[in-house]
From Swiss-Prot:
It comes from Cereibacter sphaeroides (strain ATCC 17023 / DSM 158 / JCM 6121 / CCUG 31486 / LMG 2827 / NBRC 12203 / NCIMB 8253 / ATH 2.4.1.). 5-phospho-alpha-D-ribose 1-diphosphate binds at residues 47-48, 79, 102-110. This is Xanthine-guanine phosphoribosyltransferase. InterPro entries: PRibTrfase_dom, PRTase-like, Xanthine_Guanine_PRibTrfase. Guanine binds at residues 106, 149. The lineage of its organism: Bacteria, Pseudomonadati, Pseudomonadota, Alphaproteobacteria, Rhodobacterales. It is a peripheral membrane protein. PANTHER family: XANTHINE PHOSPHORIBOSYLTRANSFERASE, XANTHINE-GUANINE PHOSPHORIBOSYLTRANSFERASE. It holds the Pfam family Pribosyltran.
Amino acid sequence: MKERLPHEKGFHVSWDQIHRDSRALAWRLDGQGPDNGSWRAVVGITRGGLVPAMIVSRELDIRTVDTISVKSYNWQEQQAPTVIKAPQAELMGDGHGILIVDDLVDSGKTLELVRTLYPRAHFATVYAKPSGRPMVDTYITEVSQDTWIFFPWDMALQYVEPYRGRD
């Protein structure tokens, strides 16, 4: 079987689609929190999880929002994930009642790292690939492992390299 380049099996996500799918994620999570169905806070994994986290927090009326910044890609190559910025320690504890949101779970390495830090948090992604699916508690759409997802914040009419560099 011929190997495909990432863009040859691409899944292009529009702003409307990420908005709809993020709202669907919020609806699936509604009433599922450990505190009488509520969540204490939403933590978005930056950068890709920022848009879905904002939409989920709005839909569920969760005002406490923080971020964790994990770098696991250098340009288009996956590398060992590292935490660049952690959320407030007082907020997080062991993660109980915290909803951690990302756009995609791919290999699962990012979520695996974050899960070791906050083992009782609930992990939710909009999209999931088979290799990473065991690391996520809730997701909306599964895509094949060899599909490259093109998010609207990464594209113009064609892929555009970030102005300041490659990562």
